[in-house]
């Protein structure tokens, strides 16, 4: 948002990202022109010219790297199963048994699914 009012920018960024994230057709965010000294609308940037962070960047971090980022530690059942919920996206699962560790990446798509990790 191209305004010198940084609090308004932060509020707008929060509301806009939440609206986008809530829509089923949105699969990601791309931020163009994040640095004030190279932005076509300098007041809209997330970093000032001296690279200090503006409040709208903190909002972005709080949502994208905080509230919307799934982090989970757990212990599987006796059958070796662990049921979890997560946001759509790419994950890395790491499991250890008897001193051996296995990692695997997978994508969690809408509708969920089952991921099987074979342990030695």
Q: How does the language model describe each region?
A:
Residues 1-120:
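Aromatic-rich peripheral "rim/lid" segments of glycoside hydrolase catalytic domains that contact
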